[in-house]
Amino acid sequence: VISAPVDMSSAALSMHSFLSHRIYTPYLLNPIIKKALANDITKDEIDSIKAVNRISDFDDIFTAPRHGYRSNNHYYHASSALPYLIKVTKPLLLTSAKDDPFLGFTATPNDVSDTVTLLETEHGGHVGFIRYNVDKDKSTHLYKQSRFDINWLPETVSAYFESIGVPFNH
């Protein structure tokens, strides 16, 4: 599992930070507002949706009630994976980055079963795991001549599968 918010309430709060609210919220919110307005909804719902400026507000007035939840908090609680990670019985690699603007709180070793491996990197943002390529001049492959190497994530996932005895094609 890569860059998945396991605690939806915490992820929603992280979207209230200045940077997330100014940069990511418009990018993510505008398309879902447009889709919501295309539904058969009342004028009051249209006015409420048009007034939204946070994803959590949208979830409170549209997403949660449309899916049978009392509020955005009820929806977030019900859709969070965190309470279930302690019950996982199959091997699972949960990869996240400390600088991911979407995740908020991530799982700790006390939150997960022994079959869950937590891998939290200092950097990587949201699914942006790269490493500095120190051998860029030695490579004959054009994509490897870049300063940054995008192979960290696939190589890490491959190594994880191999470590638990699952063959993984490179």
Task: Label every model-predicted segment.
Residues 1-67:
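Alpha/beta-hydrolase-fold enzymes
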Residues 14-19, 109-111, 134-137:
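Short secondary-structure boundary/capping segments
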Residues 77-89:
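The feature captures the conserved acid-bearing segment of alpha/beta-hydrolase catalytic domains
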Residues 82, 98-101, 123-125:
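Acidic beta-to-alpha connecting loop that harbors the catalytic carboxylate
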Residues 88, 93-96:
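Short beta-strand/loop motif that positions the catalytic acidic residue
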Residues 122-170:
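Catalytic active-site module of serine/aspartate enzymes centered on a nucleophile-bearing elbow/loop
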